[in-house]
Design a protein with these regions (language model features):
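A structural signal for multi-pass alpha-helical bundles of membrane permease subunits
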Residues: 2-206
Length: 206
């Protein structure tokens, strides 16, 4: 059913207002950032001689380089670890006969319900006892552990939806669990793995 002209105009106007509402704060910040240091424009005013060096000064004063490096290192280590562990774990929960599988999975579900604030103090004492305070491992290990419960649940639901015919055909051809996982399950699960990687990246970077 085609929309009427009035509906299209109203929808376009609402979208335009939404875009304007989202863009204006960024324009205001950019306008203020390009002014001479110590001055503040009234509203959104772009000077004829923008001071682009303000960004360099702010970068150096805030010492952004080591902070950015730390974030990159965390992401490079945490995201692959979470994706690998959760892919293997999700496959095991969905396809393999593991003793006490249901109980272990419930524990992962419980891990999703625990507020992070309740873990800060125990994590501090645990990291301190391991002698890892003021090291990158003090961030990497908790971030991996905190992202695994969600990743396990996410990947398990993905592998449970895999076509059983393909798995049975691979088994008839003599493929073991590892080959079935690597050659059949993993390629089919790439969309879910990509989504998990993006979500883990955002959680780690933030």
């Amino acid at each position: 059913m085609q929309q009427s002209k009035a509906v299209r105009i109203t929808g376009t106007a609402m979208l335009a207002l939404t875009v304007l509402f989202c863009v204006l704060p960024f324009l205001s910040m950019l306008s203020a950032a390009l002014q001479p240091q110590g001055s503040m424009p009234e509203g959104i005013q772009f000077t004829t001689h923008p001071h682009w060096e303000n960004f360099i000064d702010a970068w150096n004063m805030a010492n952004i380089t080591p902070l950015l490096l730390n974030s990159c290192i965390l992401v490079i280590v945490v995201v692959p670890c979470v994706v690998i562990f959760c892919s293997l774990g999700g496959y095991a929960f969905a396809q393999l006969k593991v003793p006490c599988k249901g109980l272990i999975y419930v524990l992962f579900l419980v891990g999703l319900t625990i507020p992070f604030e309740t873990l800060v103090t125990p994590l501090y004492y645990e990291i301190s006892g391991m002698g890892l305070l003021n090291t990158r491992l003090a961030l990497i290990l908790p971030l991996i552990g905190l992202n695994i419960p969600f990743g396990i649940v996410w990947m398990r639901s993905c592998f449970e939806q895999m076509p059983r015919d393909l798995i049975e055909a691979a088994s008839i051809d003599g493929a073991g669990h590892l080959r079935t996982f690597r050659s059949i399950q993993l390629p089919l699960a790439l969309p879910a793995i990509s989504a998990l990687g993006i979500l883990t990246f955002l959680a780690t970077w933030n």
